[in-house]
Amino acid sequence: MNIIEFEDKEQLGKEAAALIARTIASKPDAVLGLATGGTPLDTYQELIHLYQSQQLSFKQTKTVNLDEYAGLDPDHENSYMTYMKRHLFDHIDLPQDQYFLPNGASPDLEKECLRYDQLIQDIGGIDLQLLGIGQNGHIGFNEPGTPFNSMTHVVQLDENTRQANARYFSSIDEVPTHAITMGIASILSSKKILLLASGKSKAKVIQYLEQTEIHPDFPASALKLHEDVTILIDREAGSLR
């Protein structure tokens, strides 16, 4: 793992966007794995800026997202599809038929998981996977104890994870209890992985990620099994290193 520290999250976001832009420049039809939450927002803003200043085009690119809430329609205000449209897709030239998320509203979620794995395989696999990290070491919605050989699957959300996401809903009761997530094996099958972490709340988990052994109780430790992982952090997230 290559860990690079920046002064603040804005610089971190610019560098993450630059890495993504270089991936697209070298392979215009690259498949990008994308993430949601607060951490990638600066990265997405910078990607929009690069597009608007005609330094970057997504016309040939395809994207797949890590996860989606179960039980929410894609057009629900708190779905990850809505998040991606609001923060990236609606502001760039990525064709609508070239971005993909799991369908959390599917009547058969298990079948949807299989469909999503097949989709990723059919479009050539992921060239660069963007990740955040939870305070318990979760990546995607892969909570502690998730097998490292897991592919896309339905997961019951940890209560701490639901609490962390409650700020996006009017109450904790509205936060879905389940989600579809790419599994740890799905993530590790990406050619390159780019993990972002910012803020003091991520300092302990970054310290632990560096020091811990590889173990399913800390899902992010699986990244040590991959040969091309870059971790970008800001000074606050690196304050306990």
UniProtKB/Swiss-Prot annotation:
CDD domains: GlcN6P_deaminase. InterPro entries: Glc/Gal-6P_isomerase, Glucosamine6P_isomerase, Glucosamine6P_isomerase_CS, NagB/RpiA_transferase-like. One of its GO terms (biological process) is glucosamine catabolic process. Keywords: Carbohydrate metabolism, Hydrolase. Pathway: Amino-sugar metabolism; N-acetylneuraminate degradation; D-fructose 6-phosphate from N-acetylneuraminate: step 5/5. It catalyses: alpha-D-glucosamine 6-phosphate + H2O = beta-D-fructose 6-phosphate + NH4(+). SUPFAM superfamilies: NagB/RpiA/CoA transferase-like (SSF100950). GO terms for molecular function: glucosamine-6-phosphate deaminase activity; identical protein binding. It is an enzyme of class 3 (hydrolase). It comes from the Bacteria. Its EC number is 3.5.99.6. The active site is at D67 (proton acceptor), N136 (for ring-opening step), H138 (proton acceptor), E143 (for ring-opening step). GO terms for cellular component: cytoplasm. Pfam families: Glucosamine_iso. The keyword Oxidoreductase does not apply. Catalyzes the reversible isomerization-deamination of glucosamine 6-phosphate (GlcN6P) to form fructose 6-phosphate (Fru6P) and ammonium ion. Belongs to the glucosamine/galactosamine-6-phosphate isomerase family. NagB subfamily. HAMAP family: GlcN6P_deamin. NCBIfam families: nagB. This is Glucosamine-6-phosphate deaminase. It comes from Bacillus pumilus (strain SAFR-032).
